[in-house]
Design a protein with these regions (language model features):
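Short beta->alpha junction loops
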Residues: 75-76, 127-129
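M14 metallocarboxypeptidase catalytic domain recognition
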Residues: 1-2, 8, 78-82
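Mixed-charge interfacial surface used for oligomerization/domain docking
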Residues: 3-12, 17-45, 108-124, 130-278, ...
């Protein structure tokens, strides 16, 4: 059933493999959702061999990086998107929302836009201004709204609102892969170069930017947990969702999942039960304005701080983490100060009211392309809020 207003018809969804989206989440988000989704894989080149990401996994990328072999990536061709669009048209879709990694990080959006001119049906291409499960949650929101019978405009806006609400932060062993790939400049690379300091980064308005510095992976887990709970408390109305990304550090990822799931209270999912997924991802591996026209739109961009914004309530054990993260406020070797005061304020703001997740925190494996750019040792946390379709 098409809702009033906008462009009617069955709406398909296309994304790319940087979403790192576990297949189990797609299958569980709405009845028959998988039939409405196509994933266009980016291409990975290891040495002189190029393969689509769904044919060359993240483990191969990690091995190549460990051996010092050059790894590069490239966008899907417009022809790959045309094929995906037409496959959905053959499945009965009359319009498509094509949701992709930030234009500032990848030219995938440009490829999708070129393909939309040849597809022969209505395609709305959306720059998510993010990547990873922040993009993946946008895809899940789009699938839910499509399955609820909403038109392409409402489906696209649900995806935009989810991605705009998202907050992504991650720890990396080294900034060198990001520097080589042009995702962070030389000045940014210096952020993690002094002594044994390890960088925490964030996706801020579509680009990768420094967030904090820690001295060990263990401290990174604690900092990411405090940060994620504080961000989730300020996301606004809707279903709060959370994901943890990793490849090589699965044990640390589980610690972070447990911290988020234990320091919070997983709420009931759409089927009345808390849900989680730990699996390889599909494909291998701006915000919206207010809309006063009624329930056919998912709502405005969620209020709340960006990753470096004002503190919010954190989990009940956050106060114990102050000593571990407060050292970030001490002068660093380059004379600047870290964000220890802010971290301590976040921890001190802990309250007895726990964050409630719409589903249990998801553990999502990094895909090959994301691994190529952040390194196999990356560990990330993503929080977002998904608007629920009315009715």
């Amino acid at each position: 059933m098409a809702r009033a207003g906008g462009r009617a018809g069955r709406v398909g969804v296309v994304t790319d493999s940087t979403a790192c989206l576990p297949a189990e989440l797609v299958a569980g988000c709405a009845p028959d959702a998988a039939s409405l989704l196509r994933v266009a894989p980016l291409n990975v080149t290891i040495g002189d061999v190029t393969r689509p990401e769904d044919e060359l996994g993240a483990d191969a990328v990690a091995s190549a990086q460990a051996e010092g072999i050059a790894v590069t990536t490239s966008r899907p061709s417009p022809a790959a998107f045309v094929e995906a669009y037409r496959a959905l048209a053959d499945a009965g879709c009359t319009s498509i929302v094509s949701l992709h990694a930030s234009q500032a990080l990848s030219s995938t959006v440009s490829s999708a836009r070129l393909a939309s001119l040849e597809a022969g049906l209505d395609v709305e291409v959306v720059d998510s201004r993010t990547l990873g499960m922040a993009l993946g949650f946008g895809v899940l929101a789009a699938l839910r709204w499509s399955q609820a019978g909403y038109d392409v405009d409402a489906v696209a806006e649900a995806a935009r609102a989810t991605c705009a609400s998202s907050r992504t932060a991650f720890y990396v062993d080294s900034l060198e892969p990001l520097r080589r790939g042009g995702r962070i400049g030389r000045a940014g690379a210096l952020f993690g170069s002094a002594l044994s300091i390890k960088p925490l980064l964030q996706v801020d308005d579509g680009v990768i930017a420094p967030l904090a510095r820690v001295r060990s992976r263990g401290k990174a887990v604690e900092r990411l947990g405090t940060w994620a709970l504080a961000q989730a408390e300020n996301l606004g109305e809707g279903e709060r969702v959370c994901a943890v990304h990793s490849l090589q550090h699965s044990e640390l990822a589980q610690v972070l999942v447990d911290r988020l799931g234990g320091g919070a209270s997983p709420g009931a999912g759409r089927d009345g039960e808390a849900r989680s997924a730990e699996a390889s991802s599909t494909g291998s591996s701006g915000g919206t304005g207010d809309d006063a026209t009624g329930p056919a739109r998912p709502g405005s961009r969620a209020a709340g701080p960006r990753a470096d914004g004002a503190p919010g309530a954190a989990g009940p054990d956050a106060a114990d983490q102050v000593g571990d993260v407060a050292a970030l406020g001490a002068p660093s070797p380059d004379g600047t100060r870290g964000d220890g005061a802010r971290a301590a304020a976040e921890a001190d703001a802990a309250s007895s009211s726990a964050v409630r997740w719409a589903m249990a925190p998801v553990q999502a494996r990094l895909g090959a392309v994301v691994t190529a750019h952040v390194g196999a040792g990356a560990l990330g946390a993503v929080v977002a809020v998904m608007p629920e379709p009315p009715g």
